[in-house]
Structure formats: structure tokens, C-alpha cells
Amino acid sequence: MTAPLFESTITSLPLINKGKVRDIYAVDADKLLIVTTDRLSAFDVILPDPIPRKGEVLQAVANFWFDKLGHIVPNQLTGIDPETVVAENEREQVRGRAVVVKRLKPLPIEAVVRGYVIGSGWKDYQETGAICGIALPAGLKMAAKLPSPIFTPATKAAVGDHDENVSFATAQANCAADLAEALAGTGKNGAGLADEARIAAIRLYEEASAYARGRGIIIADTKFEFGIDAAGTLHLIDEALTPDSSRFWPADHYQEGSNPPSYDKQYVRDYLETLDWGKVAPGPKLPADVIARTSAKYIEAYEKLTGKTL
């Protein structure tokens, strides 16, 4: 097994951005190299310890969904082998954890779809009887399945900041303002693309949820990101239905009224909640057993979803 990768050092390509988990490099004017590291963030803080094989799992899960759901909306994939765009001595850094993608203009929103009342949605529902302003039936319990999935967009926060839930009208306005220049001459507008993203996100969630349920996994909620090409065509970008962007529950542990265990970083979040820590950088170091348990959770999620071994 290769050593965990906390940070990539690809010097043969220009570095464009380092996110919470992904390092992005320019391949050329039309393509990017995205390297999924083993970094883990919790409460919007990057923790100092990498989680072994986490990056491999995230990329493998995303690739699985991109392939499975490609008929719903185009995606960012180019089909180019990442090892062919870096220097020979850098191939180990991209093997199994990187992807070459189209350069696309991102929509300025996180496309969140919720199928169950949990997390911040549960808190919101308890206080208001709604989630992000969307009224729901009275009397729902924690982890209850919603009558139908709901779309609750959020702003995209910079590294270290928190995403903020916004109304769909605000999401449309943000897209209209941010995409106006990119859409000039295409006959499309940002508000319309926000609606396209909403429809696509719900379809993606519904189809993925049905598949995962057959594999013994409940997808409680998830977050998508979308971008557009020069013609204004919507594409699914970033990651898709991974343990980082979604809440996966084992179906055999699901019980309405309680918070099920998750195949994701919730184990780390639960540990961090036991600490006297202000949830600001720098994050605390993780014990070896928490790191090992979290790595195993990620690998288990991939294998249970796909029926394959990593």
C-alpha cells in the first residue's frame, strides 16, 4: 500500500488551486488535472492527519457514479489517463486518485438534495417546521424519510468558511449575476440554469438512492456541483455521491427516531465533538484508532456500493 498523500507536489503542471481535499492543476486551456488527496476536513477545518486510501475511495466512487448516471446530465470527464499528463516521477501521486476533466465554469451554488430529516435539516425542522424554508408535514421524527426529496441550495464557501443555506430564489439570482458574462450569446440565462441544476440534482439523487438501497445503503442527503461549457450546457462536476459529499447509512441499522451510523467522516466528527476544541484552524491531531476506523469506513462504503474490492 502506498503512503497516504496529504498534499500533491506536481511540478510539471501549473497549480491552480488547493481545496479542502483536492489539488487542481492546469493541463491546457481546455483541461484540468484534479488530484484527490487523503486530506480530511471537519467543521470546515482541514485536519492535520491524512486518512489512508481516502482519496482513492473518493475518486473510485465518483467515477462509478459518473459512469452510472451519465445519461441524466453530461459530466466533467475526458477519459484521458492522468498518468499521461504528468512527469514520470509524478505518476505515483496521481495513480488511482486523479482525473483529467474539462475546464468548465462552475455555478456559484452547492446543489444539496435531502431525502431524510437529519443533521442541520433536523435542527431547522425542530425550530421552524421547515427545512431551508420548505414547509414539511408536522410530527416528523429524526431521520424520517421525506415524502419526496427536497432541493436546498447553499452558497459555496472558501476554504475555512462555512457554506450558507439560501433560498432557491437567491440561488437563481446568484447564478444570474455570476454567469451573465459566460452565457452571453448562448440564449441561456443563469436563473434558468439554476432550475436545470435543481431538476438534474433531484433526478441524480433519486436514481442513485434507488440503486444504493438495493445494495443495502441509504443515501440520506448529498451535495452536487455543476458547471457549464462555452455553449451554456450544464455538466456535473467535482465529485458525485461520495462519502464526503453524502450521508450514507447502512440500511440494516436504520431506525426512524435515531441517528444511524454513517459510512463517512461522521465517525471523526463524533470524536471531535468530545474534545474541547473551538472548531477553528488548526484542527487537532487524530488518534491512530480513529484514523484506521475512518479509513475502513470509506473502503467499506466503496465495496458495499459497487460490489468490488479497492
Swiss-Prot record:
GO biological process: 'de novo' IMP biosynthetic process
Positions of disulphide bridges: none
Protein EC: 6.3.2.6
Pathway annotation: Purine metabolism; IMP biosynthesis via de novo pathway; 5-amino-1-(5-phospho-D-ribosyl)imidazole-4-carboxamide from 5-amino-1-(5-phospho-D-ribosyl)imidazole-4-carboxylate: step 1/2
InterPro entries, per database record: SAICAR_synt/ADE2_N (IPR028923), SAICAR_synth (IPR001636), SAICAR_synthetase_CS (IPR018236)
UniProt GO MF annotations: ATP binding; phosphoribosylaminoimidazolesuccinocarboxamide synthase activity
Keywords: ATP-binding, Ligase, Nucleotide-binding, Purine biosynthesis
GO cellular component, one term: cytoplasm
Reactions catalysed, as given in the entry: 5-amino-1-(5-phospho-D-ribosyl)imidazole-4-carboxylate + L-aspartate + ATP = (2S)-2-[5-amino-1-(5-phospho-beta-D-ribosyl)imidazole-4-carboxamido]succinate + ADP + phosphate + 2 H(+)
Record-linked PANTHER family: PHOSPHORIBOSYLAMINOIMIDAZOLE-SUCCINOCARBOXAMIDE SYNTHASE
Family from the record: Belongs to the SAICAR synthetase family.
Record protein name field: Phosphoribosylaminoimidazole-succinocarboxamide synthase
Native source organism of the sequence: Dechloromonas aromatica (strain RCB)
Gene it is expressed from: purC
